Amino acid sequence: MIVSVPDQVLALVDRGKLIARYSISTSKFGTGDSAASYRTPLGTLFVSAKIGDRLPPGAVIKNRIPTGEIVAVDAPGRDAIVSRVIWLRGMETQNQKARDRCIYIHGTPEERRIGKPASFGCIRMRSRDIIDLYDRVHIGTHVLITLRRIHDFVKPEEPSLLARSD
């Protein structure tokens, strides 16, 4: 999994081949791993826990426990963690505090903000996208959060033999 901060994109990649691509939102405070910085950490992390199996879209998760509340997309005044949580743990000195800081990939009801930095350190996704991603990744999956562009990692699509020539 690759998270490009400048592109505000999360790409699920297997051996250089793009499996899925999602628009995201990283921290509005930039990147870093200092305690209480509200920044998105950089480097290699891994999925350490997954929370929210079978919850409906918009289900609120507080302190990693479903509350039973459902929040509508773009509900005014609501900045809840919803739908699913993928909890990250850092693998490097530069991101070793990520788990203690509760850095997640999670759903947000503030879907209008997806595509631009708006979070408090986590990686936010649309509910339908986090549900899809959650079902595709496993505990132990590596996550690279980078200042590089997605096209640096993903091979261009090869033309199909079935492509039409005009």
Positions of PLM-derived features:
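Intrinsically disordered, low-complexity
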Residues: 1-35, 42, 144-166
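Short, flexible surface segments
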Residues: 41-42, 139
